[in-house]
Amino acid sequence: MPLLAKRADLRHDRSYLLVASFLMAVGWLLLGPEPVAAWGPATHVALGEALLGSLYLVPPAVRAILERFPLHFLYGSVAADISFAKKYVPDGRHCHNWEIGGEILASAESDRLTAVGFGYLSHLASDTIAHNVFVPRQLLLTSTTQALGHTYWEHRMDMHVGEEFLSLARHVVMDHAHGEADELFDEVLSRTVFSFRTNRRIFRGMIRFQGHERWQRVFSQVLANSRFDLPNTLVDRYFSLTFEHMVGYLRDRADSPAAALDPIGEVNLGLAKKVRRLAMSDQAADHPEVLEEMADAFFPIPSDPLIYWPQLTDPQFTGGVTSGIPARKTVPAPTIS
């Protein structure tokens, strides 16, 4: 076959894979029987960047690993969402289970993979705030005849965190080779209705999809027409609380506040749906002040003083993640095309 024809076929194959991944991502967003993630990729990468800029807060052994392998840490912190249809795995093998996260870290046979494991566990610690407080509250506070779902609020948070961090998430996932880490995930994570290879393809399609210009336009229009607010001050509060849980877990592991919570938030998410139905049946949904009282009663935002967040010195975050300071990139240049 002539060289030009081969190149044309290759471009066609790549385009086909991109479109296929895109369609799988869209389908899963629209039809999926479960939440796609907790915090979105931009939020997880922003949290990872905040930690990488304040490694003086974590134990020396953890710091030494993350200083050498920041890219691998960031990949682990995003790729914990690589498995879809999680509800179909055997009991105790859910990818957002603390034991699975610990198994990934224990199975790491190199410092690079250890950094991935720390990233994975940091992701789970971060999700304890997203799934037990943020999403349940928002599901209740937006009790309307057409509920704004789990995925909407996660992407809404990502939009507030900023495009710079979403771009960095795409850079981490798409522009670097992660075969070693993916082999570890394939070894430890249980098969869902999809093979790991298919899960990985959907995951990468999701990362591409969220940066797609058409998706950005559509979601921006949704935001413009939304009557539900998410103030930057509240975004900053959730971000700092999540950072506390992440650092606390890396310091104290099983004795940390995060370890006492379910990263998937199954109980609280289920409770939020029940309380929402109750609010709608009692017409409480027409009274925002009543919904606010119910949210505070069932899913209060933690008010304990922050320990680790006030110790940040990085100007990128000290004013809050929504401060508008451009994201710093701690990862190297791309290693794959």
Role assignments for model-derived ranges:
Residues 2-116, 127-337:
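N-terminal leader/auxiliary helical segments
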Residues 119-120:
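Alpha-helical transmembrane segments of multi-pass membrane proteins, especially transporters
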